[in-house]
């Protein structure tokens, strides 16, 4: 009798471990595309996603490219200083959005233009998300004067 209880306990532990492993693998598989907060323009230019894929792009708003069109339509280029991607956005921009400033946009790449549905700007004149800073530094650009996450 005692041996059966021990054997049953071991079976339950094995089933629980397999279930935990399987659920972890499935969650990881489901989140595989969402692990990166954004893609830098150089990565998007090198390996363009299909028009059906919604993703985030992040970098700096290129100087001299911000154009306000009819109504609420705005066009500009986002750059990581290795590549530049044209962006089109219809809506109200964040207050801190401007040329030479950091941004992250959500949308799709259609015919070489990123059609944004959401634009996020950095918090203040000295803040830049760590991911944007790392991507810019990886391209050889050092955004001096910007505080990073965790800096005081």
From Swiss-Prot:
Family: Belongs to the CcmE/CycJ family.
UniProt topological domain (Cytoplasmic) ranges: 1-9
Function comment: Heme chaperone required for the biogenesis of c-type cytochromes. Transiently binds heme delivered by CcmC and transfers the heme to apo-cytochromes in a process facilitated by CcmF and CcmH.
Organismal lineage: Bacteria, Pseudomonadati, Pseudomonadota, Alphaproteobacteria, Rhodobacterales
Membrane topology (UniProt): Single-pass type II membrane protein
A single GO BP: cytochrome complex assembly
Compartments it resides in: Cell inner membrane
UniProt GO cellular component terms: plasma membrane
Periplasmic side: 31-152
Entry's transmembrane regions: 10-30
Binding locations of heme: 123, 127
SUPFAM superfamilies in the cross-refs: Heme chaperone CcmE
Gene name per UniProt: ccmE
GO terms assigned for molecular function: heme binding; metal ion binding
Stored InterPro entries: CcmE, CcmE-like_sf, NA-bd_OB-fold
Alphabetically ordered keywords of this record: Cell inner membrane, Cell membrane, Cytochrome c-type biogenesis, Heme, Iron, Membrane, Metal-binding, Signal-anchor, Transmembrane, Transmembrane helix
Main location: membrane
Name recorded for this polypeptide: Cytochrome c-type biogenesis protein CcmE
Pfam families xref list: CcmE
Keyword Manganese belongs to the record: no
């Amino acid at each position: 009798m005692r041996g059966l209880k021990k054997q049953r306990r071991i079976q339950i532990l094995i089933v629980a471990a397999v279930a935990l492993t399987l659920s972890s693998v499935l969650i990881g598989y489901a989140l595989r595309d969402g692990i990166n907060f954004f893609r830098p323009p150089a990565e998007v230019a090198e390996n363009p996603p299909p028009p059906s894929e919604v993703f985030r792009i992040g970098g700096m708003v290129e100087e001299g490219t911000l154009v306000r069109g009819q109504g609420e339509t705005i066009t500009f280029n986002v750059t990581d200083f290795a590549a530049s991607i044209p962006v089109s956005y219809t809506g109200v921009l964040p207050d801190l959005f401007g040329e030479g400033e950091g941004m992250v946009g959500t949308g799709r790449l259609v015919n070489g233009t990123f059609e944004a549905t959401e634009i996020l700007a950095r918090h203040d004149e000295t803040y830049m998300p760590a991911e944007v800073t790392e991507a810019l530094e990886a391209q050889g650009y050092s955004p001096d004067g910007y505080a990073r996450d965790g800096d005081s």
